[in-house]
From Swiss-Prot:
Assigned keywords, A-Z: ATP-binding, Chaperone, Chloroplast, Nucleotide-binding, Plastid
Keyword Transport recorded: no
Miscellaneous comment in the UniProt entry for this protein: This protein shows ATPase activity.
Subunit relationships: Oligomer of probably six alpha and six beta subunits.
Function: This protein binds RuBisCO small and large subunits and is implicated in the assembly of the enzyme oligomer.
Location in or out of the cell: Plastid, Chloroplast
Protein name, entry field: RuBisCO large subunit-binding protein subunit alpha, chloroplastic
Main location as per UniProt: plastid
Family: Belongs to the chaperonin (HSP60) family.
Domain of life: Eukaryota
GO MF annotations, alphabetized: ATP binding
Gene Ontology CC annotations of this record: chloroplast
Amino acid sequence: TNDSAGDGTTTASVLAR
C-alpha cells in the first residue's frame, strides 16, 4: 500500500485484508 502521507489509509487497507 502507499501511505507516504501517514494519513492512516494503509492501516485501513491492512484491516480490510
